[in-house]
Amino acid sequence: MTAWTDHLAHRGATLGDDARSASFADATTEARSADGTIAVPLLHLGTLRAVGPDSAEFLHNLVSNDVKKLPADGAEWNSFNSPKGRMIASFLLWSEPEGHAFALSADILPAFLKKLSMYVLRSKVKLSDARADTALIGLAGPDAAAAALGAGALLPEADMKQTVADAGLRCIRLSPTRYLLAAPVATAGAAFDAACAAGATAAGTAAWQLDMVRAGLPLITAATQEEFVAQMLNYELIGGVNFHKGCYPGQEIVARTQYLGKLKKRTYRVALPAGTEAGPGTDLYAPDFGEQSAGKLVNVAPTADGGFEALAVLQCSSAEAGEVRVGAPDGPRLSLLDLPYALA
C-alpha cells in the first residue's frame, strides 16, 4: 500500500487484491457514472520513467512514433513491437524536463521494463519503475476540464499537450473531455478529492475502461501481447505510428502492412449481451472462418444494462457480414457499435 492507495481506501474505494483496480460502487452504478463526469484512480496503469541526455534518441530507436520531434509540452500514443511487428506494449508517452515518462498497463510493466533495459547498453539513460512516486488520475466527461482546474491543474490548450502546475501536478489533455493527471503520490489524494469537489464523481477502474472503449483507445495487456500489428489496433488512426521516422523493432512489418496489400483486420467497438463470459484475449468466431478464430477481444468493460462494451480486433470481412460470436462458433452474438473516428 502507498499513501495514494491508503487514501483511496479511506475514501471508501474497494481495491483489488493486487491493488491494480478500484471501485466505489457496484458495477451498474459505476458504468452509469461514465455517462457523466468521472474522476478515476488509474491503478490498472503504471508509469515508467526514462531519464538522461540520450532519452529521446534511445526511445526513438525502439518505438513506433517519433520521439525526437515530441515537444517539451507534448504527449503521444506509442508502442513497442516485436521484430515480427506485433505489439508488446502500448502506452501514452510524454516529455519531462530530464527525459520522458510513459503510462502503460501495470500487468506488463515489470517485464517491459526488463525488456527495455536490455537495449540501454552505453546509452546515457536510466529506466525506472515510477509507480512508487507517481499516481495517475483519469478525468472524463462534459465537465472534465472544470474537474482538472479544481484539482489544481493548468489546462493545456490542445489535445496531446501537457502542462505542469507549481505543485508538480501534470495535466495531459487527451481530448476536450478527457484528461490524464500525473501527480506526486504524496499529493495525489488531495488532487483527487479536489476534482470530486469540483463536480466529478469518484469512479472505479471499469468506468475509465468503458470510457476508453467508447473513445476507441485500445490498451495492450498481458492477455494480448504480441497478438496484433499496430494497424490492427487502429494505432495509426489515433496518432500512434509515424511512417517517416527511422527503423525500430518491427518497423518493416508495420510499413509493409501500411503500403502493401489490404489490411484484413481492424479494431471495432462492440456490444456483448448480459451474461457473456469473456475478457481480453477471448477469441471471436464468424461463419466465414468456421472453427478458426476471426478475431480477439482487446479491452472489455461492463455497461449499466448488465452487458459489456469492448474493443475487438476482427476480420473486416466478418465485421461486414455482421454475424460474430464470442468464445465459440455458437457463443453469444455481439453487435457492432460506432467508433468516434472513421476506419480508413
Task: List where the protein language model places each region.
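Acidic, proline/glycine-enriched N-terminal capping motif
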Residues: 1-77, 81-82, 86-88
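Glycine-rich, small/acidic residue-mixed loop/short-helix segments
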Residues: 4-8, 233-241, 255-344
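Acidic, low-complexity central loop/insert segments
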Residues: 38-39, 46-47, 92-215
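Short glycine-/aliphatic-rich beta-strand segments at the starts of folded cytosolic domains
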Residues: 41-62, 128-145, 262-273
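Short, conserved active-site entrance elements at the starts or edges of catalytic domains
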Residues: 205, 211-236
